[in-house]
Amino acid sequence: GGEFKLGIIPTIMPTLLPMFLKTFIKKYPKVKLKIEELTTEEIIQRINDGHLDAAIAATPLKIENIKERVLFYEPFVGYIPANHRLKNKKTIEVSDLDINDMLLLEDGHCFRDGVLNLCKTLNKADDESFQLESGSIEMLVKLANEGMGMTLLPYLNTLDLKEKEQHNLHFFAPPSPAREVSLIYNKNELKIQIIN
């Protein structure tokens, strides 16, 4: 019995939660699962303060007292609208990306950091007059559909797209850039049985 407090980052919450919630409830019917959507920064703080038992986040974080157990690697997928310069490419390469025509999540989202790190390797200048950052992946897709640029999506977020929007997905040629998603918890965590 008891309570288990789990934090999940916003870009993972809507896709992963429905997949594992029923299984958890069946396996631990006496445990009250309390789930919070938090940024990575908030998660780290709350794990260190003892206010969270575990979290699901993009890793590696490499934080001394936090243990990371990799759950899966989630590929990035290009979302390229019909009016974009890359629309006719069957597969895309990291070298095709230009930070100046990309729609990004706002600061504080680790998925944004992953995309920026990908683009940094290209050393492209950031001198465009228009730059937009949004708090939601759904908004990035809507803005791309309006011709405001392209975006990258975590693979699990592509599964809920409408059929019409699925046509705008362009996968990377191997090796595909991906994010590591892990279960993270304090090394001294006492609820290790549930974590396992």
Task: Describe each region flagged by the PLM.
Residues 38, 52-58, 135, 152-154, ...:
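Short beta-strand and adjacent tight-turn residues that come in two discontinuous sequence segments
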Residues 101-123, 155, 191-192:
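Secondary-structure junction motif
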Residues 19-23, 40-76, 80, 140, ...:
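Short beta-strand-centered segments that line the small-molecule binding cleft or hinge
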Residues 67-77, 129, 151, 155-158, ...:
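Short beta-strand->loop
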Residues 2-28, 32-37, 41-45, 114, ...:
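N-terminal winged-helix
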Residues 16, 168-196:
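A late-sequence structural motif
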Residues 65-102:
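Flexible hinge/capping segments at coil-to-helix
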Residues 32-39, 58-59, 125-136:
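Short beta-strand-to-loop elements that line the ligand-binding cleft
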